Amino acid sequence: MKYKLIKEVDPALSPIQQILLNRGIKLSDMYHYLNTTDADILDAEMLGSESIKAAAAALITAVNNNLETLVLVDCDCDGYTSSAILINYLYDLFPSFVTNHLKYYLHEDKTHGLSDCMDYIENNDFKLIIIPDAASNDYEYHKILKEEGRTIIILDHHEAPTVSQDAIVLNNQLSDYPNKQLSGAGVVWQFCRYLDKIRGGHEADEYIDLAALGNCGDMMSLRSIETKHIITKGFRNENIKNPFIYGMAEKNSYSLGNKITPIGAAFYIVPFVNSMVRSGTLEEKEILFKSMLKNEAFKMILSNKRGHKLGEEEKLVEQALRTAVNVKSRQTREQDKGMALVEEQIEQNNMMQHKVLIFLLEPGQIDPNIAGLIANKIMAKYQRPVLMLTKCEVLNPNTQLLSMPPKPVYDTYYRGSARGYSKSGIENFKDICQNTGLVEYAEGHQNAFGISIKKEYIDKFIELTDEALKDLQSEPLYYVDYIFKGVDVTPETILDIANLNDIWGQDMDESLVCVENLKVTKDNLTLMSPDKKPTLKITLPNKISFIKFGSSQEEYEKLLSDGYIELNIIGKCNANEWMGNITPQILIEDYEVIGQSKYNF
């Protein structure tokens, strides 16, 4: 087990100051960071004064003239929340227009942008098409739609080569907007705030919870002051007004506690939306999206719950929440099947001899929509980079030159998801893959991206990545904020760190601490709930408890001795509240045995 201090500990700093400094927050900025206000929300016109005026004018024209309007819902959590903000906001102002002249389109799969819905658009008389969270670079489709006399408004945050000449584009990446860590939901919310400004209203404030969830869903950086304020304010209990978010918080109240935090949303709300997008039917996706709409969520619909009576009804949002849980369970079962398949390949093909685990799958073996999730799990379990690739046949562009008369010639590629393993020190896995010169493409983030490799290059790719990663350590490297010695760790420090729970999220990693040379004896070691959920507990005289979930009788007995066993422990700080009492805990992530004695003096 390897661990390393993020920065040398400055004894003059409080735990809060040390941890914020370790995450790139300057001492002079810390008070502001912890106490953001509405003054930290940027002026929406910074998205482009002329563009935002044009977008508002196009929307107002559509409303005033009852023009048929389409909202294209992008296929992820940010896309769903972006579109929900816009439709809810417009319903507040123009309920008749939304009811009679506005439609939305849900993708059947994980396709982004306009490519799969052009036929639908062209078969309908939509004059205005609004696309939140997507399509900034769909230039050819913009041109086609404009030539057909349709107006397109893009409300996006994705990078693109240039601003489209055939659409009205609001995009923080393509403008002078200072905050590049604002998601599509944030851009839509800012557009609604601009509409409030020109008409003298405050309706956009009602949807900051959706903006918060969208930013969490797209993993926007919490180092951004504006983004942090949107998320912090949006998740305050008094601002949770969206039926879906409120319902998910209630369903997951045991895990979330009495409030939604960024990391809580990322673990207990966002995955239910993303699993629906990946694994839900179109009907299931629609009911989830409707549960985010105030004019739909509380409608009474026929119940489909087990054991319902004929004709029994329930609120749409209640059915949506239950459906989201069921789809997530269904996806988990598919993940488990996929895990079993690829783990069998690891053993059969002796794959652990290589630095990158490359799975070459046949079509249909694993649903492409969950391949990335399985890659994540394999990466974490086997502690090395993963490529989860499926074979596909691609028409050779030079077919007509290869034979007379020409016959179709296909090249075999393997395409899919790549995941790097940052805990081993790899921060640039995408670059490593590209530097082989053998990939057709590698696009996305450094440690989570899509990749394509021609079949004939696979063996050479394995050879080159083995060489590039020859120094890769298979065991994880934990970056910790503090290294404590045995019983020197204090309850106050653990609780101070635990109380930072509200700030953990993207680029504000949850704090890890190391406790070295901790002596475990039969007097301070307990196995709780051994028959149901075995949980290891080590209790110090100062009342700090070390907790390891998912333990076993076997693990307990290995640590049990008449003397003592000495451990180094990596863990997360937690404040456990029970019956009004708060006690400090360290939740064990990993540990190693470094010594033992038959005697305990």
Task: Name each region found by the language model.
Residues L20, D74-D76, L128-I130, D156, ...:
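Divalent metal-coordination and catalytic microenvironments
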Residues K143, L222, P243, R278-E283, ...:
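Glycine-rich, acidic loop segments that terminate in or are immediately followed by a histidine
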Residues F449, Y457-I462, Y556, I565-F601:
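OB-fold single-stranded nucleic acid-binding module
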Residues F484-I544:
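Accessory interdomain/linker segments of ATP-dependent helicases and helicase-like nucleic-acid enzymes
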